[in-house]
Amino acid sequence: MTTFSSAQEGDVPALGHLLALLFAQEQEFKPDAQAQCSGLTTIIRNPALGTILVARDKDKIVAMVNLLYTVSTALGERVATLEDMVVHPQCRGGGVGSALLRHAIQHCEDRGIKRITLLTDEVNDSAQRFYERVGFRRSTMVPMRLHLP
């Protein structure tokens, strides 16, 4: 039976492994265990920044999603950025990812969050279809990045 919960500090090694799998397939990011574990720990220790939700099969983490919080001046309300949605390859296709995503959406609704924004690789058509199936739509906004030293 799959259960959902917020990640704890003891989960960081398993989450880091999932992120390594995710970043190995993304164009813009590279696995860096130290950086990823530092980021995960920062979020877990600071719930005002965000929440990392996990799916567990028995005691093993099989999927994760990261929700980061801010305020939209356009809406005048709290909003979230959804990142790092990843399901272990051996567990894909069984509905775990869809269930975790629905759980994340409900988590946001329960906290009064009014919008969830996410980014996915431009060439990752299957991920885009996955998000569209639960109601996400393409935005006219174009993401841009400036990496600082």
Task: Please tell me what each predicted stretch does.
Residues 87, 93-106, 129, 133:
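Conserved acetyl-CoA-binding loop-helix of GNAT-fold acetyltransferases
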Residues 60, 71-82, 92, 139:
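A conserved beta-turn-beta hairpin within the catalytic core of GNAT-like acetyltransferases
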Residues 101, 108-119:
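Conserved GNAT acetyl-CoA-binding A-motif
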Residues 52-54, 60-69, 81, 86:
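Conserved beta-strand in the GNAT
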Residues 3-15:
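A short beta-loop-alpha structural element at the N-terminal edge
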Residues 131-141:
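Conserved acetyl-CoA-binding loop of GNAT-fold acetyltransferases
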Residues 118-127, 145, 149:
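Conserved beta-strand-loop-alpha-helix junction that forms the acyl-donor binding cleft
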Residues 17-42:
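Conserved GNAT-fold acetyl-CoA-binding loop/helix
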